[in-house]
């Protein structure tokens, strides 16, 4: 099924529409109430930054490739909005494994450690 989280519904292409709540915690709570237990974010610098700024990210899967990209290719936008200090604290993330994807590319998994 294809579900849409947006300010307004669209005429076609989606099986279900969720109104865009004011904050990410509220949006994720609405999705959870609908039975969504896991959401995968595949990209979008601003979306990634918004979810990190709201401290709504529970896991990271990063690929390391022997190629440096920056500027418009960065996965987080260059803004003045800081990320929560808790994300940079020792013990905020725990390594869950590394996988060799071949051709010098690695997938590194981290899980967010939350207190309480």
List PLM regions with ranges:
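Enzymes that bind and transform nitrogen-containing heteroaromatic metabolites
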Residues: 1-116
């Amino acid at each position: 099924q294809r579900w849409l989280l947006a300010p307004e519904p669209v005429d076609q292409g989606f099986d279900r529409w969720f109104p865009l709540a004011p904050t990410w915690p509220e949006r994720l709570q609405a999705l959870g109430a609908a039975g969504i237990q896991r959401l995968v974010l595949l990209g979008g610098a601003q979306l990634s930054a918004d979810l990190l700024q709201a401290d709504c990210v529970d896991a990271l899967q990063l690929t390391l490739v022997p190629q440096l990209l920056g500027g418009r290719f960065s996965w987080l936008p260059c803004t003045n909005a800081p990320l929560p200090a808790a994300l940079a604290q020792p013990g905020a993330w725990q390594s869950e494994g590394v996988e060799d994807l071949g051709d010098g590319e690695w997938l590194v998994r981290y899980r967010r450690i939350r207190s309480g």
